[in-house]
Amino acid sequence: MGIWKWLVMASLVWPVLTLRNVYDMKIECPHTVSFGENSVIGYVELPPMPLADTAQLVPESSCSMDNHQSLNTITKYTQVSWRGKADQSQSSQTSFETVSTEVDLKGTCVLKHKMVEESYRSRKSITCYDLSCNSTYCKPTLYMIVPIHACNMMKSCLIALGPYRVQVVYERTYCMTGVLIEGKCFVPDQSVVSIIKHGIFDIASVHIVCFFVAVKGNTYKIFEQVKKSFESTCNDTENKVQGYYICIVGGNSAPIYVPTLDDFRSMEAFTGIFRSPHGEDHDLAGEETATYSIVGPANAKVPHSASSDTLSLIAFSGIPSDSSLSILTSSTEAKHVFSPGLFPKLNHTNCDKGAIPLMWTGMIDLPGYYEAIHPCTVFCVLSGPGASCEAFSEGGIFNITYPMCLVSKQNRFRLTEQQVNFVCQRVDVDIVVYCNGQRKVILTKTLVIGQCIYTITSLFSLLPGVAHSIAVELCVPGFHGWATAALLVTFCFGWVLIPAITFIILTILKFIANIFHTSNQENRLKSVLRKIKEEFEKTKGSMVCDVCKYECETYKELKAHGVSCPQSQCPYCFTHCEPTEAAFQAHYKVCQVTHRFRDDLKKTVTPQNFTPGCYRTLNLFRYKSRCYIFTMWIFLLVLESILWAASASETPLTPVWNDNAHGVGSVPMHTDLELDFSLTSSSKYTYRRKLTNPLEEAQSIDLHIEIEEQTIGVDVHALGHWFDGRLNLKTSFHCYGACTKYEYPWHTAKCHYERDYQYETSWGCNPSDCPGVGTGCTACGLYLDRLKPVGSAYKIITIRYSRRVCVQFGEENLCKIIDMNDCFVSRHVKVCIIGTVSKFSQGDTLLFFGPLEGGGLIFKHWCTSTCQFGDPGDIMSPRDKGFLCPEFPGSFRKKCNFATTPICEYDGNMVSGYKKVMATIDSFQSFNTSTMHFTDERIEWKDPDGMLRDHINILVTKDIDFDNLGENPCKIGLQTSSIEGAWGSGVGFTLTCLVSLTECPTFLTSIKACDKAICYGAESVTLTRGQNTVKVSGKGGHSGSTFKCCHGEDCSQIGLHAAAPHLDKVNGISEMENSKEYDDGAPQCGIKCWFVKSGEWISGIFSGNWIVLIVLCVFLLFSLVLLSILCPVRKHKKS
């Protein structure tokens, strides 16, 4: 019945597969070619095809790299198949027979001696296939081995195998030379005693593919090593097959020859091949649950002309999961076996009538080290409505994410760096990119500035130099840019715009005055009518007509109604109307003269004399007067200059620099100085003041407190590597014999569980060809395959949050690392961390899906013992223990139907813990890391996101001996060396200062970057005696700013100009470098400071480009000429 089920399924699947017969083979390539004959390998498992078509299978390649010619030769196989005997109606050990025939297969993975080495030297590929067959259909697996140079020569190509087309895709990893495992670049090391190299020494599970190479010689007697290693009873090893396995580790390595006693990798592979000879199964997606029907044990003649049986096999029907190609062991010549529908004997405890696999795939544990992670460089340029960005890293990019950007999976490489191009569609918010675990911020405001400058320069392309000089002023973001535009427009066109705008304003005001006058007249008339009506109602009665019921406004109108309405006439137009109320009311709505009596009253009411007042004053205002225009022009220039100066600095985000004037704030010590605040984990804090004697202000002492960003240190227990795997449920049924009679392929899997239902007790659980009740066995097997390491887990034992605190109090310089509930205490200063708000706790498990620099997840519940399949931590490989398999708590059920093969059912979970976590990953807390340091027992990092907070308390005592501590002998000299970056931009500039210290060994202080009026940034630094180089970053300024290095009120003599913001690439800045709070109490910029700033700008804008002043003056003269034409001076005649 299993065969018929397989036929039905294949008949349904085959037409669908023929519609889409193109499949992908991925070959992972490192982005450098290392020394040695390294090759890369890829493979793909293809859908089933008829067994009869396998004889015509030949791989055909369209790749630019030639295929090795040796694979085009025909290999003779002994095909062993089984069939039922015609005279047998009951299943038994003698109810079937095996048949051996000779077949020719072309392109199978029969590698010759030195073939891989020759293909590397001649730049040729090796393309071959393996077959996994039952009695009816075969599933091919296509393999391709190419020299590593192909990664630089090709991106993709096409291979044909029978009805299938396989597209080979060369995919670059970010690894320099290593293998990508768990998102990290692992470099296997041949030495067992290897120590740390460039990274951390570890043991990783690496995928391996091996091919048997038949060659005669005393050094190739493989079964001699089998006998030594596995205590085999193989006595006649001289007459066994001779040769070796050649293996590729991790999809990218130099050839490994198995067995080689002095190569640890080789012996690991050798152990895997002979302890688990079936290796990884060849199940396709959807074949995790399948049924075998074991027909029975069989013997066959290999070759077909042999006089006696030489190979033991087990016949089966059902979905094939393992390779059907093997090598007979009982001959020194390689006898190739093709056994569709039969498992050859691969157990070599007894070497009689056995075989070895032609190919083997599996996993081995290898020691090695992980490649170091290099920082990223990210920059962007404006492109259309968004930004085009690139990221570089010397050692490759393992992770780059940003939800607002489109990051392509196809990466390009430039020399030894990896280049990743991506597009961000929005530039209205800053671009935050996580690259190699670093948080990079690209300030898009600078990109918009560049686009603005480009646009203005393009519009005035006749004078590009002048246009660019003006554009860099106008395109400063915020109010400052608008203030600059207003200032330039007022200077150039104020003489025309001032009278024009004044005229428009006067017109609007006169219109409003006229409206108010008319409105007042109407309101006055309404008031008179209301008073008349009230008086009439008090003396005479109602003002409503008795006939038409219309309410009249005057007595004369009421009297007209009394005469006309009884005569059926309209009192207004004397038109005939029906003598009904409704008719009169309807007529009044269309009558054109109902206001006749109101107008007569308006004429009789004496109008109030209108005094021109405001309206006349507006008419007489001399807005064309040159004196008025000049006065307003000067006033607007002064006002706009002050507003411009006040807005010449950017509004910063918190916590960063706040622009202030020169100097340091002072605090009179009447009482103790206490500061109490919270500080994010990613922020530095600098507090600087002059403490003055309240009794004598001339006496002071310098105080400088520096608190560095938080360091998170955890003592951990390395739990090992977490694996993902596929759980398979297989049913193996045979009609006779005990369950222990056969060995199934899952018996050699690392993790497996079996439940046997031995000796069927009912006819309802037996197929029709079974002998009867009380015989046979149904074996239910659960096993894990396709194991893949996905992450590393660490359990937190203890956790510590610490900061480094340094205090300069006069001459005294002290530093200490303090943690939570700890204090820095000196004679005058006390700095304490009172508490920390954190999301980590003791006992949590940290899981890293890639390099530790990329951050990870926090698990509150992680399985460490009696793990069930599906739990976090279900499949683990600790370094100090063997492979830990999960428990399968579900129960089996044997499903029976009359005259059909029993089927095993499992009611437990079939989804791995990793897949469950990935499906609900948003429900777990994550964290990012920076400045990572780690060993097996301890991990330290800094939080780039500022997700944690420390409660800080600073106390400075008022009891200070100013007489003895006031004098500070330290002398500081300043010199400005160089400047990088741009003024007025979001990214800012970096000033390089040469600072000399004399008279004392060390001194903690701050160096500022300032122009004549304002300081834009500061750097807290510990100076040592002699010359020190200090880099100070700042943001803001203007085109006239001459940036100098300053210390307090003292600045370097020579300053430097920064570049203008333009279309250059905007580099991403590290958030850890940019996150700092600086407080030195310097005063804010006042009126005097604003004027100094305006003067510096005005002198600076013209100092380098006098043509700009000439052009502006030309525009001014043009506006004066235009004013004289449009508003000529009125000539007054002398009386």
Swiss-Prot record:
InterPro entries in the record: Envelope_glycoprot_Hantavirus, Gc_C_bunya, Gn-B_hanta, Hanta_Gc_N, Hanta_Gn-H, ITAM_motif_hantavir-typ
Taxonomic superkingdom: Viruses
Keyword annotations from UniProtKB, A to Z: Disulfide bond, Fusion of virus membrane with host endosomal membrane, Fusion of virus membrane with host membrane, Glycoprotein, Host endoplasmic reticulum, Host Golgi apparatus, Host membrane, Host mitochondrion, Host-virus interaction, Inhibition of host innate immune response by virus, Inhibition of host RLR pathway by virus, Inhibition of host TRAFs by virus, Membrane, Metal-binding, Phosphoprotein, Repeat, Signal, Transmembrane, Transmembrane helix, Viral attachment to host cell, Viral envelope protein, Viral immunoevasion, Viral penetration into host cytoplasm, Virion, Virus endocytosis by host, Virus entry into host cell, Zinc, Zinc-finger
Record topological domains on the Lumenal side: 19-485, 649-1105
Pfam families with a match to the protein in the record: Hanta_Gc_C, Hanta_Gc_N, Hanta_Gn-B, Hanta_Gn-H, ITAM_Cys-rich
TM helices/strands, residue ranges: 486-506, 628-648, 1106-1126
Signal peptide start-end: 1-18
Keyword Magnesium in annotation: no
Residue ranges, annotated region (Fusion loop): 757-777
GO annotation terms (biological process): endocytosis involved in viral entry into host cell; fusion of virus membrane with host endosome membrane; signal transduction; symbiont-mediated suppression of host innate immune response; symbiont-mediated suppression of host TRAF-mediated signal transduction; virion attachment to host cell
Membrane side Cytoplasmic: residue ranges: 507-627, 1127-1135
Zinc finger (CCHC-type) boundaries: 545-565, 570-591
Intrachain S-S bonds: 29-151, 63-157, 109-128, 133-138, 175-185, 210-247, 234-351, 376-435, 380-389, 405-424, 452-475, 735-770, 739-777, 751-885, 765-896, 780-904, 806-815, 823-832, 863-867, 970-1000, 993-1045, 1010-1015, 1046-1051, 1085-1089
Membership in a protein family: Belongs to the hantavirus envelope glycoprotein family.
Protein name: Envelopment polyprotein
Gene name of the encoded protein: GP
